């Protein structure tokens, strides 16, 4: 039997374990949350790499204050570098595929659902493939990357603008004054701009944790495109008036399986190294599992 562990910086309340036959292999699968403790995460990674055949790492953004993208990228690299004996994955490529798959499923099954919708991405850079997919259905898109990544009070309003920003974002701070961008008045103005953008959107693409600080006035009637939504969070979104949640993380083996954990399971079962699995391989596997994106109504 092969062992797979998914270590998440999310809550330990949602831990689980199960045995299953998967792609011709018998797997023992664990999900372990560390409650945003980097120290505990490192300890678990070092302990489990002596026993696991593959490890998935899920970084949950609750513990980051915006702007945070650079902090997240830095921490992900530090965590993956801890594991040297066995394959380790964040499931980023699979997450992109799952989100695109979910959006196309909704578009086809609910009758041109995203056609001409007003869509706000908290991060276009983190969801570039998804942005390209949604752009096939609507050009009414905006991206909050400058606002949330760099603290600059500006939204991007086209896919071309996002591509230009992605190519040159690292130069922006050369002329921006960090002290000014970090000042309380600028932070308040940025939050006002983000809330205004949410109010004008019909669809919000964001990590579910990043919506915790918004209320019914902001989210009433919205569709949220996200991943790995627990029942507790779904209930809270319902209290805030969210109309529908599109969740790319499939429900398999009686659990919601995060992309990082599912990718680790695939790696362990196939023996392929991270990055060597093709997009078509992932899609074929999802079809074999008879998995479906989750459309949830709070």
Spans of features found by a protein language model:
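Short, charged/polar "capping" segments at the starts of alpha-helices
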Residues: 13-16, 64-65, 127-130, 151, ...
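Short, charged, surface-exposed secondary-structure boundary motifs
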Residues: 150-157, 233-240, 253-261
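Metallocofactor- and cofactor-centric catalytic cores in central/energy metabolism, strongly enriched
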Residues: 1-113, 137, 203-206, 220-228, ...
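Short acidic active-site motifs
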Residues: 40-44, 192-193, 213, 233
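Conserved beta-alpha
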Residues: 94-156
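Active-site rim loops that border cofactor/substrate pockets in soluble metabolic enzymes
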Residues: 148-203, 209
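Short, T/G/N/S-enriched strand-turn elements that build extracellular solenoid repeat scaffolds
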Residues: 212-218
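Short, polar loop motifs at secondary-structure junctions
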Residues: 60, 125-127, 208-211, 228-232
């Amino acid at each position: 039997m092969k062992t797979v562990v998914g270590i998440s910086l999310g809550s330990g309340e949602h831990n689980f374990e199960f045995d299953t036959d998967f792609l011709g292999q018998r797997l023992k699968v664990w999900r372990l949350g560390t409650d945003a403790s980097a120290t505990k995460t490192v300890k678990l990674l070092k302990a489990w790499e002596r026993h696991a055949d593959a490890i998935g790492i899920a970084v949950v953004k609750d513990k980051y204050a915006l702007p945070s993208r650079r902090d997240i990228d830095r921490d992900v690299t530090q965590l993956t570098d801890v594991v040297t004996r066995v394959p380790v994955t964040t499931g980023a490529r699979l997450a992109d595929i799952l989100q695109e798959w979910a959006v196309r499923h909704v578009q086809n099954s609910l009758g041109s659902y995203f056609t001409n919708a007003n869509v706000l991405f908290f991060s276009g850079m983190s969801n570039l493939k998804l942005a390209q997919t949604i752009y096939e259905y609507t050009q009414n898109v905006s991206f909050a990357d400058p606002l949330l990544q760099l603290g600059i009070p500006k939204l991007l309003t086209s896919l071309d603008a996002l591509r230009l920003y992605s190519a040159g974002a690292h130069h922006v701070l050369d002329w921006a004054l960090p002290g000014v961008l970090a000042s309380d008045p600028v932070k308040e103005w940025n939050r006002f701009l983000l809330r205004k953008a949410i109010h004008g959107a019909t669809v919000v693409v964001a990590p579910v944790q990043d919506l915790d600080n918004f209320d019914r006035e902001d989210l009433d009637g919205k569709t949220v495109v996200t991943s790995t939504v627990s029942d507790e969070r779904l209930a809270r979104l319902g209290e805030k008036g969210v109309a529908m949640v599109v969740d790319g993380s499939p429900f398999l083996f009686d659990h919601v399986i995060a992309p990082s954990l599912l990718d680790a399971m695939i790696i362990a079962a196939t023996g392929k190294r991270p990055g060597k699995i093709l997009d078509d391989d992932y899609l074929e596997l999802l079809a074999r599992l008879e998995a479906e994106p989750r459309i949830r109504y709070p």
